[in-house]
Swiss-Prot record:
Pfam family, one: adh_short
S-S bridge residues: none
EC number(s) per entry: 1.1.1.-
Name of the molecule in the record: Short chain dehydrogenase/reductase mfmJ
Similarity comment: Belongs to the short-chain dehydrogenases/reductases (SDR) family.
Active-site residues, Swiss-Prot/TrEMBL: 213, 217
The organism of origin for this protein: Annulohypoxylon moriforme
Top-level EC class as recorded in UniProt: oxidoreductase
Gene name tied to this protein: mfmJ
Length: 344
């Protein structure tokens, strides 16, 4: 199969064409019924609610051996784990603290993976936010949506790469799926010409709640385009998965009033159910092979990246974003980690 980079950019309008095709004409793809994950170890961030919890349920239904729910609230995580343990008593289920708004917490979590897990097969980075009001994370000064959806997720992904490479069985690549969104295809990205780029997302003059969410997900596309040049699909398969528009999730938990009512009505008419939405994660991390490395999976199919990435402008932005992101993470030796992934 052809990878996302090798596909030509799509010329089909997202609204209404691709949106309604995604929501009503796409067929979910589940692992074969005899799939056995009994020896495997998986991590899901934000796995205590919504699509993360549903993805956990689906993996456990295929006899997943060990599951780690990476959650901000361990109390809520344990409540979710109790439900899963009751349903799947043969599985080993742990709850580990992970605060995606804290670089210290992210580093502590990755360190725990390195020291406490003898094996790691798959990771689904599902935690994300969609903020209605502008706000910043006190410890970093960055706007919350970009901090959680892009910066913190990118840092965690990089820190987990060595474990996915070294702790998966010989000859079997580790799997890393980062949850994305089809809305990247319509991101306006009004601050794309700013230099430096990342601080411009912290400027309220560019703030729009809808586009900030879209742009935060687009940043991960730009970053992954470059990152996979350093990672062999023989070591770790890294991809992006879009769950589609799903009803009943907590992504829009900060939405209130009339917007919440309108969104609920629209979701009831067009939204996928959680089972179908979460199956996109499971498909990406279990079904898809090396052809999905560095790819964007939308509606269970490998899809082109947003058009911007195929342009000279997009490539220039990618290089700027790459340099600024690695500089942001200098404290965590990410350059050394990324370089180490190129070795045998």
């Amino acid at each position: 199969m052809v990878s996302s980079k090798e596909l030509p950019p799509s010329t089909v309008p997202f609204f209404p064409n691709q949106f309604f095709r995604n929501q009503f004409r796409s067929k979910p793809q589940y692992p074969p019924p005899n799939t056995n994950l009994s020896e495997k170890v998986a991590i899901i961030s934000g796995g205590n609610t919504g699509l993360g919890f549903e993805a956990a349920t689906q993996l456990l239904s295929f006899k997943l051996g060990t599951l780690i729910l990476a959650v901000r609230s361990t109390a809520k995580g344990e409540a979710a784990a109790s439900k899963l343990r009751a349903r799947y008593p043969k599985a080993t289920i742990h709850v580990w603290k992970l605060d995606m708004s804290s670089y210290d917490s992210i580093q502590e979590f990755a360190g725990r993976v390195n020291t406490q897990l003898p094996r790691l097969d798959m990771v689904i980075l599902n935690a994300g936010v969609s903020k209605l009001e502008f706000g910043t994370v006190s410890s970093t000064g960055h706007e919350e949506t970009v901090q959680i959806n892009y910066l913190s997720t990118a840092l965690l992904a990089i820190l987990l790469l060595p474990a996915l490479k070294s702790k998966s069985p010989p000859g079997i690549p580790g799997r890393l799926t980062i949850v994305s969104a089809a809305l990247t295809l319509v991101a306006k990205f009004p601050n794309r010409d700013e230099s430096p780029l990342l601080p411009s997302f912290d400027n309220p003059k560019y703030w729009d709640p809808n586009d900030q969410y879209c742009s935060s997900k687009l940043l991960m596309h730009l970053f992954l385009w470059k990152l996979v040049d350093y990672i062999s699909a023989d070591d770790v398969i890294v991809n992006l998965a879009d769950p589609g528009f799903v009803k009943g999730t907590e992504l829009a938990r900060d939405v209130s009033g009339g917007q919440r009512v309108g969104l609920s009505i629209f979701a009831s008419l067009t939204g996928r159910n959680k089972k179908h939405g979460a199956s996109t994660y499971v498909d990406a991390v279990v079904n898809k092979g090396k052809e999905s490395h560095g790819g964007f999976i939308m509606s269970w199919q490998i899809h082109p990246y947003p058009t911007l990435l195929y342009t000279s402008e997009g490539q220039q932005i990618t290089e700027r974003l790459w340099d600024e992101t690695l500089a942001e993470f200098e404290f965590a030796n990410v350059r050394g980690i990324i370089e180490s992934m190129k070795g045998n």
